[in-house]
A protein has these predicted regions:
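BTB/POZ (also called T1 in voltage-gated K+ channels) oligomerization domain detector
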Residues: 1-133, 308-413
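Post-BTB helical module
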Residues: 111, 115-253, 258, 262, ...
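Short linear motifs in intrinsically disordered/low-complexity regions
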Residues: 7, 15-16, 21, 183, ...
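Active-site/pore-lining binding-face segments in mid-to-C-terminal subdomains
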Residues: 241-336
Length: 413
C-alpha cells in the first residue's frame, strides 16, 4: 500500500511491522506508514491496515501554548460516538484503532499539517488547484479529504482553505465528472457540502448531480446505476444529505417496475415504496409536494425566475430558458413515470443554460443570467429535499402505498 499522496509517483516500500501484533481477520497485513510513522511519536493509530505514529498535539485546532484535552481531539477525529475506538495507542501491538476514516484521508491531512516548503508533494498541494492542467480526480479527492477532516477537527482556517481549492477545481467539473466515483467519495462530497456557504454548497450538489446524470436517452452507465442503488439503499446517505438521497431516489424510481434493478437489487420493502411513488408521482407540474411550479411556469411573476432579468436581457433569458429547461415540457402526463423520466434530465439542461449565459455576447452587464442560475440551483436543491420528504411519507404509510397513489399499476412483488 502506498504511503504517498500522489499516484503519479512510484510508492516506496512499506516498513514491516513487528510480529507481536494481534491476529487480524482474513490475514489482513498491518503495515507502518512509510512517511507518518514518526520515531518519537507519542500515540500509535491504526487506520485501515496502516499504523501511524504521531504526536496528538498536531490534531489541536490551533497551534500555541494552550492546555488542550488531547482525548477530545481524538473524539473529534473519530467523529461518530457510535463507532468506538479500540486499543490504547501505546504500541504496535495495542494501537488505537479508528474505523471512521481511511488511511488515505489521514495521510492527506498529515501532509497539510506536517508538509514542508520544497517537498514536492507539499508544493503540489499548494499549487495544483491553480493549474487547470492538474485538475484531476486524485487532486480533487486530496483537497476533499483535507477539508472534511479539518471540519471534523474544528480547524476552520484550514477547512476554508480546502474549500477554496475545491472551488477552483470545480471550474474543471466537465472533465472530472467523466471519472468513476465511488459511493464513499460521493458521500464525502455531500458531507462537505453541509456548509453555511450556500453558493459553495450549491456548487457541490450541482457537481454530484452531474456525476449522476443519465445520457440523453435516459440511461445510466452501469457503474453509475450501481452507485445510485448503493446511495438509495443507504440510510446514512439520507442522514447526511437529503439532496443527494432525493436525487438517487428519483433516478432509481425512473427505472420503472420492469427494470432488472428493481427486481434483483432492491428489497421487497423498497419496491413497495417505489411502486407507490410510481403511481403517485404523475402530472408533476401539479404535484404540490415536489414544488416545481417555478420550472414549468418561468414567466409567472410570483414563483417564476425570468422576472429576475432586466429589460436589456429579458428576451434573451426567455429564449435561453425555452431552449434548455423548456425542453422538459409541461410535465402534465398522467402516465406513470413519463414526467419522472423527463425530470432526470434537469442537470443536463442546467448545464446548457449555464453555458448559454456565459456567452461574451450577453446583452447586459448585470449578469442577470447568473442570478437566475443561482436561483435555479437553489430550487433544484429544494426539489431534491422535497423528494426525500416524499420518500419519507411513503415509508410511513403502511405497505408503502400512499392514500394518494393511483390504481392499475402492476404491484408484482
Amino acid at each position: 500500500m502506498s504511503a504517498q499522496v500522489d499516484v503519479k509517483v512510484a510508492p516506496p516500500p512499506n516498513n514491516p511491522v513487528p510480529s507481536d501484533l494481534p491476529a487480524t481477520p482474513a490475514a489482513r497485513a498491518i503495515i507502518r506508514d512509510s512517511t507518518y510513522y514518526l520515531d518519537d511519536g507519542s500515540t500509535i493509530l491504526l487506520i485501515g491496515n496502516t499504523l501511524f505514529k504521531i504526536h496528538l498535539s498536531i490534531l489541536v485546532p490551533s497551534i500555541g501554548p494552550n492546555n488542550y484535552d488531547y482525548d477530545s481531539c481524538l473524539r473529534l477525529l473519530i467523529g461518530n460516538p457510535g463507532f468506538p475506538s479500540t486499543g490504547k495507542g501505546a504500541s504496535d501491538a495495542d494501537p488505537l484503532a479508528i474505523s471512521t476514516l481511511s488511511a488515505r484521508q489521514f495521510r492527506h491531512l498529515l501532509l497539510a499539517l506536517l508538509g514542508r516548503p520544497g517537498d514536492p508533494f507539499y508544493m503540489a498541494l499548494l499549487t495544483d488547484a491553480k493549474d487547470r492542467c492538474r485538475h484531476t480526480q486524485e487532486v480533487f479527492i486530496r483537497y476533499l479529504d483535507i477539508g472534511n477532516l479539518d471540519d471534523r477537527l474544528h480547524m476552520w482556517n484550514l477547512a476554508d482553505w480546502a474549500h477554496h481549492q475545491l472551488e477552483l477545481l470545480l471550474k474543471s467539473a466537465s472533465q472530472l465528472i467523466e471519472k468513476s466515483w465511488d459511493a464513499e467519495t460521493v458521500v464525502q462530497i455531500a458531507t462537505f457540502g453541509k456548509t453555511p456557504d450556500e453558493e459553495f454548497s450549491n456548487q457541490l450538489h450541482v457537481f454530484l448531480r452531474r456525476i449522476l446524470t443519465p445520457n440523453p436517452c435516459g440511461n445510466l452507465a452501469p457503474h453509475d446505476l450501481s452507485l445510485c442503488v448503493s446511495l438509495y439503499g443507504s440510510l446514512g446517505v439520507l442522514t447526511i444529505s437529503q439532496e443527494l438521497f432525493g436525487w438517487a431516489f428519483l433516478l432509481v424510481l425512473s427505472l420503472g417496475h420492469r427494470s432488472a434493478t428493481w427486481s434483483t437489487k432492491l428489497a421487497r420493502e423498497d419496491r413497495l415504496i417505489l411502486y407507490a411513488a410510481q403511481a403517485e408521482m404523475v402530472k408533476l407540474s401539479e404535484y404540490t409536494p415536489l414544488g416545481i411550479s417555478w420550472l414549468v411556469q418561468p414567466r409567472q411573476p410570483t414563483n417564476g425566475l425570468l422576472h429576475l432579468s432586466c429589460s436589456l436581457c429579458s428576451a434573451r433569458c426567455a429564449d435561453t430558458w425555452d431552449t434548455t429547461f423548456g425542453k422538459l415540457g409541461t410535465l402534465q402526463s398522467a402516465m406513470p413515470l413519463d414526467d419522472v423520466r423527463q425530470l432526470i434530465h434537469l442537470p443536463r439542461y442546467r448545464q446548457m443554460f449555464a453555458k448559454a449565459i456565459s456567452s461574451t455576447s450577453w446583452p447586459c452587464k448585470e449578469k442577470c443570467g447568473e442570478a437566475i442560475l443561482q436561483s435555479v440551483d437553489a430550487r433544484i436543491n429544494k426539489m431534491c429535499q422535497s423528494l426525500s420528504e416524499i420518500h419519507a411519507d411513503l415509508v410511513k404509510t403502511p405497505g408503502g402505498v400512499s392514500e394518494n397513489a393511483g390504481v392499475g399499476i402492476p404491484y408484482v412483488i
